[in-house]
Regions:
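N-terminal capping segments
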Residues: 1-64
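Non-catalytic ligand/cofactor/substrate-binding and regulatory segments of enzyme domains
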Residues: 1-15, 112-127
Length: 127
């Protein structure tokens, strides 16, 4: 049942464009977690920045990376090789982290200048 909810979420979000602060890699992941587990994690982030520079500034003021925020709200750290459908995969890129959703052998992420990108897990670090 949860696999079905995950795939429904991805299909619903696939065509939506990237927008800093409301539809970027981190809000995509937080909204996903909220919709699957009936939480409200995205509200602390959504709409707080509108540019990449704004995201970096917000990150500094927020005081937690995405991974730390998820762990402080009940998540746990695992190796990417242990990820299963619905797990969150995070890439550290410079001064911030990029969140993605594991779909089994595939991974979904929201990248700038694109809508949802789906790629193979083994290509995960090249996103």
């Amino acid at each position: 049942m949860i696999d079905n909810k995950i795939h429904q979420y991805i299909e619903k979000e696939r065509s939506k464009p990237f927008v800093w602060g409301s539809r970027d890699c981190n809000t995509f992941v937080l909204n996903f977690i909220d919709s699957i587990y009936n939480l409200d994690l995205e509200k602390k982030v959504k709409g707080k920045y509108k540019t990449e520079f704004g995201a970096i500034k917000f990150q500094k003021n927020f005081g937690q990376y995405l991974s730390e925020y998820l762990i402080s709200n009940g998540g746990k750290k695992i190796l990417p090789t242990q990820a299963t459908i619905g797990d969150i995969l995070i890439i550290k890129k410079g001064v911030y982290e990029l969140g993605h959703i594991c779909l089994g052998a595939l991974v979904a992420g929201c990248l700038e200048h694109e809508s949802i990108v789906i790629g193979r897990v083994q290509d995960f670090n090249s996103f």
